[in-house]
Amino acid sequence: MKKKAVILLSGGPDSTTVLEIVSKTDYEIYALSFNYHRRNSLEVQKIQGLIKDYNVKQHRVINIDLQSFIGSALTDDNIDVPKFKNTDQLPSDIPVTYVPARNTIFLSYALGVAEVIGARDIFIGVHTNDYTNYPDCRPEYIKSFEAMANLATRVGVNGEKITIHAPLINMTKEQIIKKGLELGVDYSKTISCYDPTEDGLSCGQCLSCIVRLDAFKKNNVQDPIQYV
């Protein structure tokens, strides 16, 4: 009987690379995505096309309201997504695109799903560039959540260890794209943009777009998605 794995899937290059990595193992894959604001609704649409390329046992899209978490450009319509010209302009501190407790919320849902379906492995696509700016992407956070998961669940208390896997945790975006290209990831079906147009074009100037474009450039590969 195959082991089951829950994968947090956003439709971006990082989680898609994780999906590709896990798809080459013997895990039975259960993908979990979230629709939490209009600015991420395009991600959810992209996932529908992306997931057809993989042998995913089940894909769940969970609708949650994070708009009560005001103060983030990704959940508050009154805050503009900051735009930049290059990587030199990117913030070195926690940016306004940080969503309070987002990964804790997402991982908590994943933990609940894992316990229900009998999975002991959860995968998330956080990496080096993420935890430079986002506190809930750091290695120590992942380790702490795993410890909590094993304290707070029936399976954990019964000695069946739950593991939070972050296979990209020590990689930069450049290295992730390189790895994904080697594995055959179709990045044309992914999106990174924090502020896409209504017809699905990426802005090319938000933090996420700038980092993505830089990663493809360093790999001497044209980014296959369309920009404004």
From Swiss-Prot:
Name of this protein: 7-cyano-7-deazaguanine synthase
Needed cofactors: Zn(2+)
EC numbers on record: 6.3.4.20
Annotated catalysed reactions: 7-carboxy-7-deazaguanine + NH4(+) + ATP = 7-cyano-7-deazaguanine + ADP + phosphate + H2O + H(+)
Family statement drawn from the similarity comment of this UniProt entry: Belongs to the QueC family.
Pfam families found in the cross-reference section: QueC
Pathway it works in: Purine metabolism; 7-cyano-7-deazaguanine biosynthesis
Residues annotated as binding ATP: 9-19
GO MF terms, alphabetically ordered: ATP binding; ligase activity, forming carbon-nitrogen bonds; zinc ion binding
Entry-linked HAMAP family: QueC
InterPro entries linked: QueC, Rossmann-like_a/b/a_fold
Source organism per UniProt: Rickettsia rickettsii (strain Sheila Smith)
Note describing how the cofactor binds: Binds 1 zinc ion per subunit.
